[in-house]
Amino acid sequence: MTTALDLALNAADGALRTLFAKPRASRTCPTVPAQATELSLEDKALSGALMRVNHVGEVCAQALYAAQALGTRDAVLRKHFLKASQEEGDHLAWTKDRLDELGARPSLLNPLWYAGAFGLGLVASRLGDRLSLGFVVETERQVEAHLASHLERLPEGDHESRAIVAQMKDDEALHASAAEDAGALQLPAPVKMLMRSAAKVMTTVAHRI
């Protein structure tokens, strides 16, 4: 039987692994050309900044799902959150590896982003499982739109980053649909607007820091 202490310890372990350990993917990184494309310094800097933002998004996804898994009392729903977290863990590994390849660093504020997202996830879980799932749906839909915009902004020659972002976008859509199928309630419009504003702050800051 899983106790509250077990769940709390698992959440703490997940936070430490996300922030300080090298992430490992359970799936192979999306197919890229056998020979890496040479990017100009300008294109490399742009790709690095965009992939840093995407990496921050995956750090936050780990925090959100960990908090919601901790907060729910429904064992089936907890498994749903943990499964999604594992799939998002692939994204975390892919984006971190791509940052390394581009010679770019992760955001220096990752511990802050993680803490904020974990807090939001706990608040969402306290509102009830269906609203918590609604929070997942809206988060994933916003991330999906954000990734679509990155596909438009990434250099055409950066096939590696584009392949990763395209796969991530498809996965986010599946996570949103799965949450809807699990009984998600739609969030009020003001909450959606607040989430967009918070995401805008995060992406703007993470692009640079």
From Swiss-Prot:
GO terms for biological process: ubiquinone biosynthetic process. GO terms for cellular component: plasma membrane. Pathway: Cofactor biosynthesis; ubiquinone biosynthesis. One of its GO terms (molecular function) is metal ion binding. Keywords: Cell membrane, Iron, Membrane, Metal-binding, Monooxygenase, Oxidoreductase, Ubiquinone biosynthesis. It is found in: Cell membrane. InterPro entries: COQ7_proteobact, Ferritin-like, Ferritin-like_SF, Ubq_synth_Coq7. Fe cation 1 binds at residues 58, 88, 91, 172. The keyword Iron applies. It is a peripheral membrane protein. Binds 2 iron ions per subunit. Fe cation 2 binds at residues 88, 140, 172, 175. Its cofactor is Fe cation. Its EC number is 1.14.99.60. It catalyses: a 5-methoxy-2-methyl-3-(all-trans-polyprenyl)benzene-1,4-diol + AH2 + O2 = a 3-demethylubiquinol + A + H2O. It comes from the Bacteria. It is an enzyme of class 1 (oxidoreductase). Catalyzes the hydroxylation of 2-nonaprenyl-3-methyl-6-methoxy-1,4-benzoquinol during ubiquinone biosynthesis. Belongs to the COQ7 family. This is 3-demethoxyubiquinol 3-hydroxylase. It comes from Polaromonas naphthalenivorans (strain CJ2).
